[in-house]
Regions:
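Short, small/polar-rich motifs associated with maturation and membrane association
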Residues: 1-327, 331-333, 337-339, 418, ...
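Short, solvent-exposed loop/turn motifs
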Residues: 23, 35, 64-67, 169-170, ...
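Extracellular/periplasmic, surface-exposed regions of secreted and cell-surface proteins
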Residues: 160, 175, 256, 277-280, ...
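Conserved small-residue
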Residues: 218-266, 348, 696, 713-815, ...
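Extracytoplasmic gating/loop element in the C-terminal half of outer-membrane beta-barrel translocons
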Residues: 260, 270, 457, 564, ...
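Acidic/polar loop-and-plug regions of large Gram-negative outer-membrane beta-barrel proteins
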Residues: 262, 339, 344-416, 615
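Glycine-rich, aromatic-lined ligand/substrate-binding cores of catalytic
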Residues: 814-849
């Protein structure tokens, strides 16, 4: 007993900050080798009982961890970790200390990026950066995520961000090679990149070997499966469909057309089209260095079988880089990358429709002589009769896509290579010159084949199409950098010049009439031939200068002049200036005697960027040779000249504040406004010109919003660590100018969005649904005049009509969300870790085009319909007077137009998604070191586990880009996203 008392001592003490001698709050104090611990109170004090001669471990974020012998009375001083304080953020052409940034930049490190196994960086960022909306338009393997930074500022030109990889614009990379990703969101940071940065910049820094480091090998492998998610999309089963059809037929006709034996057939066509798709990723990387050389090399394989049968992708990529000191004044960086990929698509768009539209009464397989199903898919032609037993084929689409998929295919193959040579010349310790030279080439081939043994109304004799594309690019960037410090004054500047040339070639050929199973073009009768050859060039010059005083006041100015061959000679040069300033308040003397705010910075920026992301040479009149005149090839005009085309221009303003409380809670708030002017639009012209439209600069759009981010280290003691982060971005989009101030429509597959001054760029324009008349079950629409105003009765109430053609369209919602964001958390204890990522979107409207045929009130009697019995929306069908129903009465061959384009099918697209959960274990160093390992991690990860949404389709996360065949927010037989389960292991030697 006395020995035990003698073995313990009571320890009291205070922990101080070495920089300002202030007590430190919340310092974690652990008895080394045990789980005993405590934290300091608000005055920096602690008290605990520990074994005599115990060693205390003190840790605090941003400070060096220290070990100290325990005594009864202790005064402990902790020093800041210079490496953390001087954390450098890569901006592509330059690097800036994080504390000294004057721009809106968010950096995410590899640890928070690689919890999602994906070949696409967009998925890695989803829900992790405020103001950045990442959308997966579907589940087709190989499709890239769509990224929007601070809204959409262009209608016809691309609004996607540009990637800068290791200082090279447009570089390629493998996600497993990523070290950090920085998202540049305002003109202060993006202005140096000019036109390419109109949609923002994503700066990727890849892993590299360090000079003087030992050789290490990293191995990573993940494997698992993916299942299709159908969300709230529920189709009728055999019984519900049978009873639904009973309401569409007269009793005598129903018995003849729909025999009771159909109730014995209940085929789930979706199960025939979809399966569990395998997904796997393997990566090996080697890095190391000698005194003057650092090297890194990796090889990666990614394979994914699509959940839709017959689809998938395979990709192999390699990366190698060398950093070498050639002389004291010269060093060199060399990097090469290659990617080889192959993608298989659904051989027909009809497959996604047929998976749900086919009647459950139709069996997809051939029946044998005994009436039993075989494993062979049945062939159906235009006669809509089964060849095996001559029963009717009830489905309206008189073909069997499962049979066709046995013979037909659509696929693409590509190979990309890039090389970078960079030389850094150090004239003095304050003056440096860098030249970066890049070369890249890419080859792609796409093939589409329809076998004559399958039924296709367009090509009963078979069809083959092949297209090939080749691209080559060369670029050089040359930058002179200098900087120095005189007392409290620091000055840095750089001046640079870029030049790039590129060439792209494309050829295509199609033919018909080949023999069965022969998919060679030379076995066909020529059907069409096409192609193009497009060269291009650009140059730019830029200047940037920055100044700070006392590490408290910072200002940066940038100017870039850029020329592009996309525009006519007199409009080729664009001028893009920008400026940014910040005040690091926490470095002021009056902030040194307080304990709560450990970092506080105000920042502001304003600048101009451009956009030239349109097809080349739109300013020229073009001719086509695809037409005949008197049976001879003739050149006919295909496009009007538009010689005054010029750059789209974006004026960007941003204000921000960065705060850190008690060195555990980081927070940022940003306000921004971006005015995009001189938008490139297709403007109507007089029919007498022989054309309907011409491309001109004729519009403006404004985006304004607020972004908020908070990251907190909630717990860091006793081997426990808990971090949590939340971010949200609110954006308002408004069209501020249209050609001649006249609104116009963007239309795809009969659905329209109106572009009008004062409205969102993606404003849905259609007739407004008013519900169902409870007295007779008729569909109702609100009465609207030609100007989009409601027609009111004498009492001032909205009036309705059951005549679809008696009313007009109006704006009924937008495809743009009000806000989006994410919540992410990481918990770890004693090697065990759990990472959880979520993302959310609110306030957008989705037009569910699929419902026009699958929720059609009798208009499509030979299509299966969406279930009302199993719907999660509480849908009901009108049956008798007095029913307050969501669906009108069903009528055979419905002519009420209840399924025509209207806001009936415009749905709330808001959702909250459990994006990813990763659970794993890091083996202790003491254990794995015996096997010469420096790291051994095992983990299990699951993606898309749950989604809360009211949307009746398969997934509310859909396309946010408008084009010739689609609109932002338009849902139409989309490839469903998948839920993925994978296991993985990472080992380092």
């Amino acid at each position: 007993m006395s020995m035990a008392i003698y073995a313990d001592i009571s320890v009291k003490g205070t922990v101080y900050d070495a920089d300002n001698s202030e007590p430190m709050i919340g310092v974690s104090i652990l008895v080394k080798g045990t789980t005993m611990g405590t934290i300091t109170d608000f005055d920096g004090n602690f008290e605990m009982t520990v074994p005599d001669k115990a060693t205390l471990q003190l840790s605090y974020m941003g400070y060096k961890t220290i070990e100290i012998r325990a005594v009864e009375n202790m005064q402990i001083i902790m020093e800041t970790d210079a490496q953390q304080l001087q954390e450098v953020v890569s901006l592509g052409y330059s690097a800036v200390k994080k504390a000294e940034l004057s721009s809106a930049v968010v950096t995410v490190d590899a640890e928070k990026l690689t919890d999602v196994t994906t070949p696409d960086v967009g998925n890695m960022l989803q829900g992790k950066v405020a103001g950045v909306q990442v959308t997966n338009a579907g589940g087709q393997p190989g499709d890239a995520a769509q990224i929007r930074i601070r809204g959409t500022g262009s209608i016809t030109a691309s609004a996607a961000p540009v990637y800068v990889v290791d200082g090279v614009m447009g570089g390629t990379f493998n996600p497993n090679d990523v070290e950090t990703i920085s998202v540049l969101k305002d003109a202060g940071s993006t202005g140096i990149y000019g036109a390419a940065a109109a949609g923002g910049v994503i700066v990727v820094t890849t892993k590299s070997g360090k000079k003087g480091s030992k050789v290490s090998v990293d191995l990573k492998g993940t494997a698992g499966g993916k299942q299709a998610l159908f969300g709230n999309y529920r189709m009728m089963d055999s019984k519900e469909l049978y009873e639904y059809h009973r309401t569409l037929f007269k009793p005598t006709t129903f018995i003849a057309e729909r025999p009771a034996s159909l109730l014995q057939q209940d085929w789930n066509w979706a199960k025939e089209f979809f399966h569990i798709g395998a997904i796997q990723n393997y990566n090996v990387a080697v890095k190391g260095g000698s005194e003057h050389v650092g090297y890194y090399a990796s090889l990666d394989y990614f394979g994914e079988d699509g959940t839709l049968k017959g689809t998938g992708m395979k990709k192999v990529s390699g990366h190698a880089s060398i950093k070498a000191d050639i002389a004291k004044w010269l060093d060199m960086n060399v990097k090469v990358d290659f990617t080889k990929s192959s993608i298989e698509y659904a051989p027909s768009w009809m497959m996604l429709d047929d998976a749900f539209n086919k009647m459950p009464w139709d069996c997809p397989y051939v029946y044998d002589a005994n009436g039993k199903t075989t494993k062979e898919y049945v062939y159906i032609d235009e006669h809509r009769e089964r060849p095996d037993n001559h029963d009717p084929w009830y489905s309206g689409s008189y073909w069997n896509s499962l049979h066709s998929a046995e013979y037909n295919y659509a696929k693409s193959n590509s190979f990309d290579f890039s090389g970078v040579l960079q030389l850094n010349v150090h004239f003095t310790d304050w003056l440096h010159f860098t030249t970066t030279n890049t070369f890249s080439t890419g080859y792609s081939k796409s093939s589409e084949y329809t076998d004559r043994r399958t039924f296709d109304a367009s090509f009963k004799k078979g069809y083959k199409n092949e297209s090939n594309g080749i691209s080559k690019t060369f670029g050089t960037t040359n930058i002179l950098k200098g900087g120095n410090q005189w007392g409290a004054h620091s000055f840095n500047a750089m001046i640079g010049f870029e030049y790039g040339i590129w060439k792209s070639e494309y050829t295509s050929a199609a033919g018909t009439g080949m023999p069965n199973g022969i998919d060679a073009l030379n076995a066909t009768v020529p059907y069409s031939v096409g192609g193009y050859h497009v060269p291009g060039a650009s140059w730019s010059a830029f200047l940037q200068a920055s100044y700070d005083y006392g590490k408290r006041y910072f200002i940066t100015g940038t100017y870039r002049a850029e020329a592009s061959s996309i525009f006519a000679p007199k409009h080729r040069v664009g001028h893009f200036p920008s400026a940014a300033a910040s005040w690091l308040i926490s470095n002021e003397q009056f902030m040194q005697n307080q304990k709560v705010v450990s970092f506080l910075k105000l920042r502001a920026s304003y600048g101009v960027t451009g956009n030239n992301n349109i097809p080349a040479y739109q300013y020229l009149a073009t001719y086509t040779l695809n037409n005949l005149y008197q049976n001879n090839v003739a050149a006919t005009s295909s496009r009007l000249a538009s010689p005054d085309l010029k750059w789209e221009t974006a004026y960007m303003a941003s204000l921000g504040i960065d705060l850190t409380f008690i060195k555990r809670i980081d927070m940022s708030i940003d306000l921004y406004q971006t005015d995009n002017t001189d938008l490139l639009l297709d403007v109507p012209v007089a029919p007498s010109t022989g054309f309907f439209k011409v491309t001109k600069n004729a519009g403006s759009v404004r985006n304004r919003g607020i972004e908020f981010r908070i990251d907190a280290n909630v717990i860091d003691m006793n081997k426990w660590r808990w971090d949590i982060g939340f971010n949200i971005g609110l954006n308002q989009n408004r069209v501020t100018k249209t050609p001649d101030h006249i609104p116009f429509l963007q239309t795809a597959i009969d659905v329209s969005q109106q572009v009008k001054e004062g409205q969102d760029i993606y404003s849905w324009y259609m007739k407004e649904w008013a519900g169902v008349n409870p007295d007779n079950g008729d569909p109702l629409w609100y009465m609207v005049d030609e100007d989009g105003n409601y027609i009111l009765d004498a009492a001032g109430n909205k009036t309705t009509t059951n005549d679809y053609n008696a009313t007009h369209a109006r704006v009924v919602g937008t495809a743009s969300p009000k806000f989006s964001g994410g919540i992410n958390t990481q918990v770890s204890w004693n090697g065990i870790f759990v990472h959880i990522n979520t993302n959310f979107v609110y306030g957008n409207k989705i037009y569910n085009k699929t419902r026009e045929t699958t929720d059609a009130d009798g208009a499509y009697m030979d299509y299966n319909q969406m279930s009302l019995v199993h719907s999660k929306q509480g849908w009901t069908r009108w049956e008798k007077p007095g029913d307050n129903a969501t669906h009108p009465k069903a009528i055979s061959a419905n002519e009420s137009h209840s399924n025509a384009v209207s806001s009936r099918y415009l749905e709330d697209g808001s959702f909250f998604r459990l994006r990813n959960i990763t659970v794993g274990y890091d083996f202790p160093t003491k254990l794995i070191s015996k096997a010469k390992m420096t790291k051994c991690r095992i983990y299990f990860t699951a993606d898309n586990l749950a989604t809360a949404t009211k949307f009746s389709g398969m997934d509310p996360e859909i396309n946010m880009v408008s084009g010739s065949n689609t609109l932002a927010g338009l849902y139409n037989s989309n490839y469903p996203v998948g839920r993925t389960f994978q296991g993985g292991v990472e080992i380092s030697f």
